């Protein structure tokens, strides 16, 4: 059996659950239970804080788990787990920031003994050790942005996605410590077990098929026969476009291909200019 640790709340919880649902791994949640069954009797789910999941996976409490890359590093377990895939969302940066009114504008302005407030003491400590700077790390459990303004810190080390919260609190970024995205991690011993490894691989393939499909679209159209080669150059597809006969018109063929979503805006007018009509663009659930 596979124990799958998932975030019980937070910014990555909902998008992760949506991906798993699209992947066909339906999770049956009863009330506020910390454990849940899935459509596969051999896969069970446990819900936990995202910051605790790296430790749970490293210790073997869970076989696999979803968490932030930054949290794996903060827990010092990056050598005790395997990174299986990057979800490509939940992007954030751990940054060093100081009040806009301060004289700190670069890391060179940080003096020995300055105080840094953070929820990420281990990552922050490693950062300053690499810089060979001796600072005092003050661990907080929230509201880090206020620390410099109430006199308990000179700087902060905090997680940000857009930088909006920092700007609203009159803080400026001095340096980036680490960037992070949502990751699927696995216990190393679990991957050594043949049965568990096979089941984990099934989960990885299912998730990858959803993540890959999210960046693609299926485009379908009817087009003149004599324009097929020109259209083929525009939409090579994953293995070339599929072309079939249109029964109602000998001069037309049906063409469909998988294309990148970000190409659609410029692609459709070009196809239309070549005589393509009845153009349909359809989302894709999964691509294997």
Curated annotation (Swiss-Prot):
Its main location: cytoplasm. Keywords: Amino-acid biosynthesis, ATP-binding, Cytoplasm, Glycosyltransferase, Histidine biosynthesis, Magnesium, Metal-binding, Nucleotide-binding, Transferase. Coiled coil: none annotated. It is found in: Cytoplasm. Its cofactor is Mg(2+). Its EC number is 2.4.2.17. Feedback inhibited by histidine. Pfam families: HisG, HisG_C. One of its GO terms (molecular function) is ATP phosphoribosyltransferase activity. It is an enzyme of class 2 (transferase). GO terms for cellular component: cytoplasm. Pathway: Amino-acid biosynthesis; L-histidine biosynthesis; L-histidine from 5-phospho-alpha-D-ribose 1-diphosphate: step 1/9. PROSITE patterns: ATP_P_PHORIBOSYLTR. It comes from the Archaea. GO terms for biological process: L-histidine biosynthetic process. This is ATP phosphoribosyltransferase.
């Amino acid at each position: 059996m596979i124990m799958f640790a998932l975030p019980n709340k937070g910014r990555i919880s909902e998008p992760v659950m949506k991906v798993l649902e699209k992947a066909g791994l339906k999770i049956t949640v009863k009330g506020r239970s910390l454990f849940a069954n899935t459509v596969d009797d051999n896969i069970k789910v446990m819900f936990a804080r995202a910051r605790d999941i790296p430790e749970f996976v490293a210790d073997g409490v869970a076989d696999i788990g979803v968490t932030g890359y930054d949290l794996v590093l903060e827990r010092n377990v990056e050598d005790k787990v395997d990174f299986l895939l990057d979800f490509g969302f939940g992007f954030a940066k751990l940054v060093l920031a100081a009040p806009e009114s301060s004289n700190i504008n670069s890391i060179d302005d940080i003096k020995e003994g300055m105080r840094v407030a953070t929820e990420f003491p281990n990552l922050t400590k490693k950062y300053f050790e690499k810089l060979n700077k001796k600072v005092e790390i003050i661990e907080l459990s929230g509201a880090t942005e206020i620390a410099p303004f109430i006199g308990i810190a000179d700087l902060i080390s905090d997680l940000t996605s857009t930088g909006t919260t920092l700007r609203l609190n009159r803080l400026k970024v001095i340096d980036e410590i680490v960037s992070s995205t949502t990751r699927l991690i696995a216990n190393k011993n679990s991957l050594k077990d043949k049965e568990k490894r096979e089941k984990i691989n099934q989960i990885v393939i299912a998730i990858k098929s959803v993540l890959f499909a999210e960046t693609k679209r299926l485009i379908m159209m009817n087009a003149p026969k004599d324009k097929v080669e020109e259209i083929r150059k525009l939409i090579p597809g994953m293995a070339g476009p599929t072309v079939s006969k249109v029964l109602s018109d000998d001069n037309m063929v049906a063409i469909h291909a998988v294309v990148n979503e970000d190409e659609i805006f410029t692609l459709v007018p070009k196809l239309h200019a070549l005589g393509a009509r009845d153009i349909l663009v359809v989302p894709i659930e999964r691509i294997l």
